[in-house]
A protein has these predicted regions:
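Conserved SAM-binding loop of SAM-dependent methyltransferases across substrates and taxa
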Residues: 158-170
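Conserved SAM-binding loop
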Residues: 187-188
Length: 327
């Protein structure tokens, strides 16, 4: 790996982020190409069209697209791979980009201003995009195996998971909790746009503090399924992991299943050009946020000590990322 690879990869990563953000990938739909005439059919202003045309032009230079003489823009194998993995670019560039540029400027490692450098909505969106591409089928199949009625999503982000679950399971209702005000604002918009106001509600709170909210206790007691994707490591850095798990059990006393997914420390010691996507980015940002990332074996020990029975462990098709079904 050379410096040129890293530099060009950084520029390409930003390009990929904007291809998704500005809706260029969306123009392909489920196809591998689209006709450029579609840009005139869309309700874009001149500035938007110029931005999209420039993004397409640079995407051909980076080898993401092919601009053919017949007016079609086609995805290359690299472009298809970028689109499939776009969630990781939304997560890193959109969610943590500002943090990764500025974290060394923070004087106090306990200063909450570091969280102001993180775009929680983009972190949630990127996680959801990656979830849909790699993990969602496994999670839905697991939910279908269970008899679910009232589900709570800890760290719900923009409520994408809850919305999808309620679309699949007609009689299910959901509650989402997230500490990010941006993510909750996005969730409220998504819930409204999907006509789910009567089935899903969201709360802007720290999960551990929500457990003491008297206005939520009655709702918590109706929950039969708890889900949480890529957030346990945050909770485990607030309090002792076993205490956190026991608190969740007490908070949701009638929950029959806990579906908890997280990413663990990589076993690799050196990054190479063959290293898989995401893992090192995950470890990098959390290290400089002073958030410890654990090993899978440690989670198994925490669950056991908290009194959970591990019913199933499933790999989620993202490096070092697993789903635990607990009861």
């Amino acid at each position: 790996m050379l410096a040129s690879n890293l530099f060009n990869g950084y520029i390409g990563s930003n390009l990929c982020y904007h291809l998704e953000k500005e809706g260029v990938f969306e123009l392909f739909g489920s196809n591998s190409s689209f006709d450029k005439s579609i840009l005139k059919e869309k309700i874009f202003d001149n500035r938007k069209i110029k931005i999209i045309e420039s993004l397409i032009s640079f995407s051909t230079k980076f080898g993401f697209f092919v601009d053919s003489d017949d007016g079609k823009i086609s995805l290359t194998p690299l472009g298809m791979d970028m689109r499939r993995n776009v969630g990781f670019f939304t997560w890193s560039i959109g969610g943590y980009g500002n943090f990764m540029r500025n974290f060394t400027d923070l004087k106090d490692e306990k200063n909450n201003s570091l969280y102001n450098l993180i775009d929680g909505a983009n972190v949630a969106l990127g996680s959801r995009q990656a979830n849909r591409e790699y993990m969602w089928n496994t999670i839905v199949n697991e939910l279908k195996r269970l008899n679910i009625s009232k589900i709570v999503d800890l760290g719900c982000g923009a409520a994408g998971a809850l919305i999808d679950i309620c679309k699949i399971f007609n009689k299910v209702t959901g509650l989402g909790i997230d500490v990010s005000a941006k993510a909750i604002k996005a969730a409220e918009i998504n819930i409204r746009n999907n006509s789910m106001d009567d089935r899903i509600c969201v709360v802007n709170q720290n999960v551990m503090e929500a457990a003491y909210d008297a206005s939520l206790i009655a709702t918590f007691e109706t929950v039969d399924t708890v889900i949480s994707f890529m957030m346990l490591h945050d909770l485990f850095n607030i309090k002792d992991p076993v205490d956190v798990l026991r608190k969740l059990q007490k908070t949701f006393p009638k929950a029959k299943r806990f579906l908890l997914a997280d990413t663990f420390v990589s076993d690799e010691n050196t990054i190479t050009k063959e290293s898989p996507i995401f893992t090192y980015g995950f470890e990098f940002v959390h290290h400089f946020m002073n958030i410890k990332i654990y090993k899978k074996e440690e989670y198994i020990d925490f669950f056991s000590k908290a009194g959970f029975e591990i019913e199933k462990i499933q790999y989620l098709n993202v490096p070092n990322t697993y789903l635990f079904t607990l009861k």
